[in-house]
Amino acid sequence: MSKVKATAEKCQLNISRIQSLLSQLEKVNAESLLFDTDNTRYVTAKIFHLAQTQEKTRKEMTAKGSTGIEVILCTLENTRDLQTILNILNILNELASTAGGRRINALISKGGARILLQLLLSASKESPSNEELMIVLHSLLAKLGPKDKKFGVKARVSGALNISLNLVKQNLQNPRLILPCLQVLRVCCMNSVNSAYLGKNGAVEILFKIIGPFTRRNTGLIKVSLDTLAALLKSRTNARKAVDRAYVQTLISTYMDWHRHDTRHRHMLIRKGILQCLKSITNIKIGRKAFIDANGMKTLYNTSQECQAVRTLDPLVNTSSLIMRKCFPKNRLPLPTIKSAFQFQLPFMPTSGPVALLYSMPPEVDDVVDESDDNEDTDAETEAEAENEDSDQICKNDDIETDITKLIPGQELGRTLEDLKMYERFFPELTEDFQEFDLVSNEPKPGAKLGPIIVPTAGEEQPEVPNNFMKNLARRSCNISLEDESNQRPTFLDMSKNVTNKGNSLDQKVHVDKDGSCYYYSNDIVRDLEKLSLHKASGNHPCRNGCVSAKDKPNFLPHPCNKSTSSSISCSNSLFEKHSMHLGPLCCSGIAPDDDESSPLDEQVMREMTDFDSILPLHDPDLYIEIVKNTKSVPEYTEVAYPDYFGHVPPFFKERLLERPYGVQRSKIFQDIERMIHPNDIIDRVIYDLDNPSCSAHDEIDILKFNSKFESGNLRKVIQIRKNEYDLILNSDINSNHYHQWFYFEVSGMRTGVAYRFNIINCEKSNSQFNYGMQPLMYSVQEALASRPWWYRVGTDICYYKNHFSRSSLATGGQKGKSYYTITFTVTFPHKDDVCYFAYHYPYTYSTLKMHLQKLESLHSPQQIYFRQEVLCETLGGNGCPVITITAMPESNYYEHVYQFRNRPYIFLTSRVHPGETNASWVMKGTLEFLMGSSATAQSLRESYIFKIVPMLNPDGVINGNHRCSLSGEDLNRQWQNPNSDLHPTIYHTKGLLQYLSAIKRVPLVYCDYHGHSRKKNVFMYGCSIKETVWHTNANAASCDMVEESGYKTLPKVLNQIAPAFSMSSCSFVVEKSKESTARVVVWKEIGVQRSYTMESTLCGCDQGKYKDLQIGTKELEEMGAKFCVGLLRLKRLTSPMELTLPPSLIDIENELIESSCKVASPTTYVLEDDEPRFIEEVDYSAESNDDVDPDLPENIGDFETSTLEEESFSDSEITRTHMSGQST
């Protein structure tokens, strides 16, 4: 106890002592005329001793409210005694050395930097200057400088720059003095004006004298000199001076010296400093040339290879990589033009816009690369992978609409009512009287018990439908338990139980000639799997040599085969018995897929492959072929890709986000750099080229063969770089010169056990989910024949990075110096001579949609479901744009039931305006399947709404393999404000449907446009809100007090509760200026739909909820489409609980289903489990969005339209009872 008391007394004594000393100094400062030099020297020495030995003294001097710093600085400013000055400088050094940040800021705020610079100026006037004073003073300035934003300006204005530089010049042999001087200069060089000033006064030459030649002495001085030099060389004037004096070669030689001698890696910072100097010099064109001429590429490449084994040397390898990539000569993309390889003549040429600009260029203009892409304005940081992703976009806050008058929705038809009457025929449900229909009333009797509501997803069980194929898949693929096997979903539709042999195809394509004859080129069959081709036959042709059966081995001569489009041909085991096409047997290079000869197992597989009706109820290969025949493409495709013909079954296994190994991107970049260093190792052979159809495939065994001449295919050119490495170039959208993202192509002729590297080298976006766990998709024909007919994620060593191919300013909006990006992935194929397909995402073609719609129409129950499919309009390419109407048939043809039928609110859905966003079609498929389902939930939904659906807004873009545009070369989702009936017919007429509904006072309750998002994870929505838009701007508070219904958030919040992939935290309801012409904003603003949304589905995967860390698949996308429907049913409860007269028991059962999430047990059967808790989504690495931005928005109170916040957690039945009780009272 006595010890504690003594310590306390000692602390009090110290505090009293420092206060006393400061009081003495303050008194001396007040009596400046009677300045006592000896006393001041004594007091400052005592303070220095206490500050040096006692932390509490330092705290007391800098504590809040203390005047210690002011007293010390005042004394420094007033005294002329050298020892007193040194004492005070030492005191300030002690204060700045410990807990430096806060105390240094305190010194700066009290004017410390200004006083010290004045002291430096006065001290420099003495001759000779005091060395100790200069060392201490510069040391203190070097500590204050980095914390003072205006230090560089203060130093230049006060004249301190010249003083410090002259000290260095005059004392090159005095490392102790010039070290703090260089530290001050290093800080001053952060100011570009200071850098230029110092360069003019010989600073660059002085620093090169210090850093060379190689020596191990004074390494600290060398390090600071290199840092200062690197800062100086950021000035282009200084960089040019360094190049003119051949300092680039000096730096490279010095770096090699340190690399050879620093074997223990103790001086890595010096080596990095040299690289930073090279990095600064190579910002200019002559610097890059000097670096290449000095053999810098090879030097840094070799040293980097030697450093890669040591993890601690990664900073050296990374900086070397940046320098080499910057100096790598900009290459021309090996294309004759960046315009699409396919041309389509528009009905008329627009007078303005990108298409007009594209075709106004003289033919002699080279649009692939600019005349001088290697300009001198290159910034060092532009080559870094952390490049600002929004540098070429307008600022987010500037993009937000601030004019409230433009935000207020108003129903602006824009067309006369007479003009809109043309759309009356698309709404037969509003005039149908059902007198000629044989309707059976399903009205429940009072007290009757209804059956349970089946799981609210896209399907319903029908155990009697055979499912042998799914069981076999389970046993073969992932050993699914018998319990899980029994839960697999049969079709939910009223399907025929007659199974036909539609899976006997061992081939990948059917070939159909215009004249109706079919030829078998046995060499193609044996080597490649005979291609599926399309014939438009007329009449029967005699079969000269007969058809090749599945068991016959074809010879090497073409065999014409009898064709008929209406009747079957007499070819046993033919897959196309009802159509004018034929397939040969699978036999790759004379070798069976896995065995030397056909085995009983192969025959068993073939038998099992025929039972596809049970798992793909909407897929019919024969029907697909018939539809493709009538699909019009610009390239006039005559082939069908195997996956589209045969169909896709979601795999049983989960596909996790890929974890990228450390250093894989760096390794790929170095391999690219090797192309310049070792050019003789590069094959550079074109093996596929749409621009040169005569470029035939090479016959060498070791060369892969490529093809994309089928619906939705996109691959323009392939160049073999090394034996197992290929550069791939994507085709631009038709009538455009960019939009390279979607790919879909075929590869064949591979070997097993070989790692093939594929580089797609003309990507445009500055980042991609391929860097964050996403993998491309592959479909293997041999895997499909082994009962695994699915797309699955493949690829290792995947990364996305900037490459050395220049982008023309004609494709970048006038910006020069842009580069393309590379997607690279490595694949080892499991089967020799397989035929595989690669895609950016799960393909979903226009013909697939037409097939699904026809199957839905033929399989639905007409007594329960009102289904109409009509052609809204014809596209530019001559393809029909379907529009679908789905609702429940009226209970009877009595007036009351028909009246209720006609007055159901509308739900308007659209999808696939961007062709590359194929996931939108899979979500739409889930929605359509659910709406056509036979469950009680689906029936309730149909009885609640009339669904008007345009499932594919851009058929031409989908057919022709575009990523974003239609044949007009424009983004259709930017044409909604003023669509042109000739150039944008699908948008014009879809908007016309909405305008018609608005004109007859039947504005839809919900509008939703399905999209895909390539840069973010999860599924989320963008909506429209005036209040939230204004809240994100700097508008005054008065404008934020506006009253706005919060019903726009109801549906997203419901989906957040029931859909595992949905993330409310990613949703945004801000209206941006750049999105004012999109469907979401136009329908909200002009049609007056408050709940107008864009629903974005990730192309990658999820980072929250049940699917966290998993890549998304078609079953999750279809589930999302079904969940959207369930959310609409919940929306009905929340907004109009009295309108839907379901018994409370039925509402309670459905509420239990809605408040849980789905667990997928088979490709199409969903089983319920407890919902996952919400996860707060981390800030996404990219704010870019093709359709909308994604700011973080706090959830506002009162989002639901019900009267109190507590109702968010109510069940549907509770809400209903609450409203009923409220009305009864």
Swiss-Prot record:
**Any coiled-coil regions, as ranges:** none
Keywords of this entry: Carboxypeptidase, Cytoplasm, Hydrolase, Metal-binding, Metalloprotease, Mitochondrion, Nucleus, Protease, Zinc
Q: Where is the composition biased (Acidic residues)?
A: 366-392, 1181-1193
A single GO cellular-component term from the record reads: microtubule cytoskeleton
* Catalytic reactions on record: (L-glutamyl)(n+1)-gamma-L-glutamyl-L-glutamyl-[protein] + H2O = (L-glutamyl)(n)-gamma-L-glutamyl-L-glutamyl-[protein] + L-glutamate; C-terminal L-alpha-aminoacyl-L-glutamyl-L-glutamyl-[tubulin] + H2O = C-terminal L-alpha-aminoacyl-L-glutamyl-[tubulin] + L-glutamate
Which residues are listed for Zn(2+) binding in this entry? 914, 917, 1011
Q: Which GO terms describe its biological process?
A: C-terminal protein deglutamylation; cerebellar Purkinje cell differentiation; eye photoreceptor cell differentiation; mitochondrion organization; neuromuscular process; olfactory bulb development; protein side chain deglutamylation; proteolysis
**Top-level division of the source organism's lineage:** Eukaryota
Q: Does the keyword Metal-binding apply?
A: yes
A Pfam cross-reference name: Peptidase_M14
Chain ranges of the Peptidase M14 domain: 842-1132
Q: Where in the cell is it found?
A: Cytoplasm; Cytoplasm, Cytosol; Nucleus; Mitochondrion
Q: Which cofactor does it need?
A: Zn(2+)
Q: Cite the active-site annotation.
A: 1096 (proton donor/acceptor)
Any one GO molecular function term: metallocarboxypeptidase activity
Query: Which family does this protein fall into?
Result: Belongs to the peptidase M14 family.
Name of protein: Cytosolic carboxypeptidase 1
Record organism? Xenopus laevis (African clawed frog)
